[in-house]
Design a protein with these regions (language model features):
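Extreme N-terminal tail/first-helix region
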Residues: 1-23
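Charged, gly/pro-rich active-site loop segments
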Residues: 2-9, 81-158
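Structural motif corresponding to alpha-helix initiation and N-cap regions
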Residues: 14, 59-60
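A generic structural signal for nonpolar/aromatic side chains embedded in well-ordered alpha-helices
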Residues: 21, 65-66, 116
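Short solvent-exposed loop/turn micro-motifs enriched in small/polar/acidic residues
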Residues: 22-24, 37-38, 87, 136
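Short beta-strand segments
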Residues: 24-58, 74-75
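Broad gene-expression machinery/nucleic-acid interaction feature
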Residues: 26, 40-42, 71, 95-97, ...
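Helix-adjacent hinge/juxtasegments
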Residues: 55, 61-91
């Protein structure tokens, strides 16, 4: 179903991929957009219990795209060091494929947005206040990961 990586020496382990998912701050979410065009958008997210969660408004391009087709892809660049004298980039990145689901259960939504808030802010009181302030306008999306892979520059392979 998913393609195998051609350059297997450069493939990251599953643990390396998950470590990147846990520490990265921003990902690019790719969706099936309007009129057959791809739609990609940066999102803040949290990796929790083997799934990806992000939040946003209850309506808009992202939510419409997910409702029309739940198949998504996420990419994250972990490292991108341009080495001018070698005319190359020492990179490390991951890509995942999965299915997005708009959460309906208040407990699931709260758990996800609380974890998301605490990923970016250590102040539990501030996170709780923000959740309460935005709750009625909040939409939370869960991505069930179906395929996860990562790759790094050959120069980084040990």
């Amino acid at each position: 179903m998913f393609r195998e990586m051609r350059r297997k020496k450069q493939k990251l382990t599953e643990k390396q991929c998950i470590d990147i998912l846990k520490k990265a701050k921003t990902a690019t979410l790719a969706l099936h957009g309007d009129d057959g065009y791809p739609y990609s958008v940066p999102v803040n997210y949290v990796y929790l219990d083997g799934k990806i969660y992000f939040h946003g408004a209850k309506s808009g391009h992202k939510i419409d795209a997910i409702k029309n087709n739940p198949k998504v892809s996420i990419s994250i660049i972990d490292q991108e060091d341009v080495i001018e004298e070698e005319l190359t980039t020492y990179f490390r990145s991951i890509i995942l494929f999965g299915k997005a689901k708009i959460l309906q259960d208040d407990d699931e939504i709260y758990q996800a947005v609380n974890a998301l808030g605490l990923k970016y802010c250590n102040d539990e009181v501030a996170v709780e206040k923000e959740i309460q302030r935005e709750w009625k306008n909040l939409c939370c999306v869960e991505i069930i990961i179906e395929h996860l892979t990562g790759k790094q520059a050959i120069e980084l392979v040990k």
